A protein has these predicted regions:
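N-terminal Sec signal peptide and the immediately downstream disordered periplasmic leader
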Residues: 2-5, 13-73, 79-85, 240
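Structural signature of Gram-negative outer-membrane beta-barrels, strongest in the C-terminal barrel
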Residues: 243, 253, 302, 351-357, ...
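Gram-negative outer-membrane beta-barrel transporters
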Residues: 356-357, 390-397, 485-487, 510-592
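Extracytoplasmic beta-strand/coil segments of soluble accessory domains associated
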Residues: 79-123, 140
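Transmembrane beta-barrel wall of Gram-negative outer-membrane proteins
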Residues: 183-210, 221-259, 276-297, 349-356
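Outer-membrane beta-barrel signature, preferentially recognizing the C-terminal barrel domain
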Residues: 268-291, 335-338, 427, 433-488, ...
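Conserved C-terminal beta-signal and adjacent last beta-strands/turns
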Residues: 194-197, 239-243, 430-432, 528, ...
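Short acidic/polar hinge/loop motifs at secondary-structure boundaries
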Residues: 119-146
């Protein structure tokens, strides 16, 4: 903690040095006023109720990350943005391209639902989504919902939802490109085409990321081999405006990646030579929305997410504890997963005070691999209904219920209640929610050869939170705080039980529903963004978030693995002169246990980064990013590698046709 405070003071001193430059900006009032709107708190949130709703009436705990946020921080990966979000814990098992898990409010990564343009991308075999290969290219917005959201989204949303949206083309045709070079022989390059012609808008992007990277096992444990990474990503969104306010949207995202691997083990890590994982990911979605009357609208969404992942075990490995060489365990294995989804939603504006929504959802998951998991299908049909009430723009709330029917384990019913009060006089919002959730067992837990238990049912949860948002200075300053509580029942855990597991496994290990856990804690945040009317600290943005999370396995009284009690994040932005923007980010992660038995701890750490952009002309921008400024030595996962101090720089260009 002492080092954290010292580094924070250094960052404050850095910005204090820049403050005198502010006086030179007196002639830039108009330009700055135009940019003020860019960094204001987003006015509308969609994922909280599946309908556009003003932020002042949102009764869920939600955070929004915009494309502008990611651009100013020069972020390459979505996971780098999520690491700074409130109530979110992200853990990487090495460098770029290695497995990354994301958890919300103490839940597991399989209890966090991830959507890209309406398509569910959680793995059918593992349950979680691996963020390792998801870049920020062509992403417009990320909405993070904390707390159980199964009433709207079904299985996997027990902990929360991460909803990612692709950019929508607008304005005259624009062609852009970027080129970046930096530490670890990293090269990134890409191009974009976007715009709107008549009723058609489009946004296309293609990028390549190639790096020698660093060892997936931490170099402090003796690892010397670099584990390289390559990523090709393509993204497209095409929309058509239809008569009578109708709309067609088509979204596509493709990723081809190749990453070298090591044996990241808490007790016996190894450098592995020749081990790789190659994957191809496709995400497609299409939606059609059309108002039928002044009070009745509908939206139909079809989506498909597909992944093929090939694991190559390598030819030789060196144990970093004993120094012994051996042949890596395992054989080449390809896993193929597929997820299809249909959603048809109808919204009825009964009165100005009441909006009713109802919908049908169909979800199908398929999975197979070369290790004996034959093609299996999990499918579900679900219906949901929701009422949103708004009384005089002061009292508002939602109530909803959902029924899911699965082809494997039966049914699940969930519901959600929220309420809020907004005081216009003091610009204060009070909010609370209570919800239930569930998570269906994964294909591996049900059917993996010599392991799966086909008798498993769903995990279940209860979630509650209460919070307050206080605005000052015409909403340019916001203070928030709240408490949350989650209770998980029937958690699926892998156990050693020769008698129980005998029908399923000769290894005597199998999944059972024996787990119960709870998480609780409190959150606090502060954000400030300048407005065009005020001169004090003009050009400064500041965000700080703190989360305190107490987790407990109710069967063993142990803390849940890899969840810190305390974590902080901070983002400070400043524009000393009109063409320049500087951002400093820092995050602190408290000590935590690496395993369920709480017999191995990971120490606390804080990591700081610096990003700067400079507009050379209206068409050309240069940028710089420095990561791990203070060369912190830490591990997110026991023995996993992390980057040392590293620097990256690049140039962006964009040329638009005359309107």
């Amino acid at each position: 903690m002492l080092f954290f405070i010292v580094r924070l003071i250094l960052c404050v001193c850095f910005f204090s040095f820049l403050m005198p430059l502010q006086s030179a900006r007196a002639q830039q009032e108009i330009a700055m006023a135009d940019q003020a709107d860019i960094i204001e708190t987003p006015e509308v949130v969609v994922s909280a109720t599946k309908t556009p709703i003003p932020v002042a009436r949102v009764t869920s705990a939600v955070e929004v990350i915009t494309a502008e946020d990611m651009k100013r921080q020069n972020l390459r990966s979505v996971i780098d943005a999520l690491r700074l979000a409130q109530g979110v814990a992200a853990f990487s098992s090495g460098g770029p391209g290695t497995d990354v898990s994301v958890r919300i409010r103490g839940g597991s990564s399989a209890q966090t639902l991830v959507l890209i343009d309406g398509a569910i991308v959680n793995s059918a075999t593992l349950g979680q989504y691996n963020f390792a290969n998801l870049t920020t290219d062509n992403i417009e917005r990320i909405e993070i919902l904390r707390g159980a959201q199964s009433m709207l989204y079904g299985s996997d949303a027990m902990g929360g939802v991460i909803n990612i949206t692709t950019k929508k083309g607008q304005g005259p045709p624009t062609v852009g490109a970027f080129l970046e070079y930096g530490s670890f022989a990293t090269v990134r390059e890409g191009g974009t085409v976007s715009g709107k012609q008549g009723i058609v808008d489009y946004s296309l992007a293609l990028s390549r990321w190639d790096t020698s990277s660093f060892s997936a096992v931490n170099y402090r444990r003796g690892a010397t081999e670099r584990d390289s990474y390559r990523n090709w990503t393509g993204s497209a969104r095409v929309g058509v405006d239809l008569p009578k306010d109708g709309r067609l949207d088509f979204n596509f995202r493709w990723t081809n990646s190749d990453v070298a691997l090591d044996n990241v083990s808490a007790t016996s890590p190894s450098d592995v030579f020749g081990s790789k994982n190659r994957s191809q990911e496709y995400v497609f979605s299409g939606s059609y929305q059309q108002p039928l009357t002044e009070w009745w609208s509908q939206k139909l969404t079809l989506s498909r997410a597909q992944e093929a992942s090939l694991f190559l075990p390598g030819t030789l490995q060196r144990n970093l504890v004993t120094g012994a060489f051996s042949t890596p365990f395992g054989t080449p294995n390809e896993t193929r997963v597929l997820s299809n989804r249909i959603e048809w939603q109808h919204d009825f504006r009964v009165t100005e005070m009441l909006l009713l929504s109802g919908g049908y959802q169909f979800r199908e998951q398929q999975g197979e691999n070369d290790s004996g998991l034959t093609n299996r299908i999990l499918s579900s049909n679900a219906g949901f209904a929701q009422a949103q009430v708004n009384l005089w723009d002061r009292l508002f709330g939602t109530a909803g219920v959902r029924y899911d029917s699965y082809n494997v384990f039966g049914n699940a019913t969930t519901y959600r209640l929220t309420g809020g009060y907004y005081s216009k006089e003091t610009d204060t919002k009070l909010r609370t929610s209570y919800s239930t959730g569930f998570r269906a067992p994964t294909m591996n837990q049900l059917y993996f050869p010599n392991f799966g238990n086909p008798n498993l049912g769903p995990e279940k949860s209860q979630s509650m939170d209460v919070g307050v948002d206080q605005f000052f200075l015409s909403k340019s300053l916001k203070l928030s705080g709240g408490f949350f509580w989650n209770r998980y029942r029937n958690l699926i855990v892998t156990t050693f039980d020769p008698v129980f597991c005998a029908p399923f496994s000769t290894f005597q290990f199998c999944p059972q529903q024996l787990g119960d856990a709870s998480t609780k804690g409190w959150e606090a945040s502060l954000s400030y963004a300048y407005t065009s009317e005020r001169q004090f600290l003009r050009g400064l943005t500041f965000q700080a978030q703190y989360t305190n999370t107490l987790t407990r396995d109710l069967d063993t009284a142990a803390r849940l693995p890899r969840w810190p009690v305390d974590q902080w994040s901070m983002v400070i932005g400043y524009q000393p002169i009109e063409p320049m923007w500087i951002t400093v980010t820092g995050r602190y992660v408290g000590s935590r246990f690496n395993t369920t038995g709480n017999n191995q701890s990971l120490r606390a750490f804080d990591v700081w980064s610096l990003a700067a952009t400079y507009d050379v002309t209206k068409q050309v921008q240069v940028y710089l990013r420095a990561e791990n400024l203070f060369n912190e030595k830490y591990e997110e996962v026991a023995s996993a590698g992390v980057p040392i101090r590293s620097i990256f720089g690049g140039v962006r260009v964009a040329f638009s046709a005359k309107p």
